[in-house]
Amino acid sequence: MSGHSYASVVDRIYSRKSSELYDNIAYLHHPSGVTVVVLRNIPESEVVEVDFGTTKKHGADRSTNQVSGKGKKGALILQPDSKLCTFKCKDGSEHVVRAGVRGTLVEMNDRLKTTPDFIRTAPDNQGFIAIITYGAGVRETEGMGDDLPPKRLFLKS
């Protein structure tokens, strides 16, 4: 029997990049300039809670932020050290996820409120953390590191 190796669906569409500042996150970068923030180092223990925190200025939950229109009106501006969320594991450990890049926060994954373990069990799709854009005409930004190897699927024939 011979096997075949294929790039995952995510890796066929997005390029996987590391963060220059934080080793716990990775970016799935689309050629259109949209970037999905995902976990790079998956915790061993079950994730039991995700806290999207509050902004200092408005005191609002980031996951309830409403963005509208082509200009992304209402989106939050992120700095590399902006905290996106904190998640807690069953073993008592707590992990902070920061943006790592300068950009505009378009969406937080509010599904993580009801099913927080998606961060661990499906990090590249249902368990993504945030979606970031960079403004008109900007396709890449500082803070993204080297390309990471794509995930491969192995099928037996």
From Swiss-Prot:
InterPro entries to which the protein is assigned, alphabetical: Abitram, Single_hybrid_motif
PANTHER family membership: PROTEIN ABITRAM (PTHR13651:SF0)
Organism annotation: Caenorhabditis elegans
One GO cellular component term: filopodium tip
Gene3D superfamilies: 2.40.50.100
Top-level taxonomy: Eukaryota, Metazoa, Ecdysozoa, Nematoda, Chromadorea
Protein's GO biological process: dendrite morphogenesis; regulation of actin filament polymerization; regulation of filopodium assembly
GO molecular function terms listed in the Swiss-Prot or TrEMBL record: actin filament binding; actin monomer binding
Protein name: Uncharacterized protein F54F2.7
